[in-house]
Amino acid sequence: MDFSHSDKVRALQEQVTAFMDAHVYPAEARFDEEMEKYRRGGNPWQPTVIMEDLKRKAKALNLWNLFLPESEHGAGLTNLEYAPLCEIMGRSHIAPEAFNCSAPDTGNMEVLARYGTPQQQQRWLVPLLDGKIRSAFAMTEPDVA
């Protein structure tokens, strides 16, 4: 199996690295400060100004929903193509959300894209893809909960 990166992936690596250097790393301290302010105020579950700005910039550069394979909504990358981008994004605790590639949203979007009804996709997938809402999931094992 050939594990070398395609020209497309190398270009995306350069774009993601440049975005991280120009926008994400410099925003980390401000993000942490905003979150601390929200925690002290008793409501850490609200969007930060800096994260919304990062999302807007990532969308504008088409560095958005890179995780979605075989989909009209994503970059159409395979896992092998997406992995080196994850390595770059994984260098910052705020990057996955900035690129709309954070758990559990990614898995939930994949499930909705593949198996959701048109109504479910309209109600939940579209706002998740746009980064307007967040999602969750819960699971248990038989005879446990």
Regions from the PLM with identified roles:
Residues 1-16:
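Intrinsic disorder at enzyme termini
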Residues 9, 20, 117:
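Residue-level signal for inorganic ion chemistry
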Residues 18-28, 58-59:
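N-terminal glycine-rich anion-binding loops that anchor highly charged ligand groups
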Residues 29-145:
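Glycine-rich flavin
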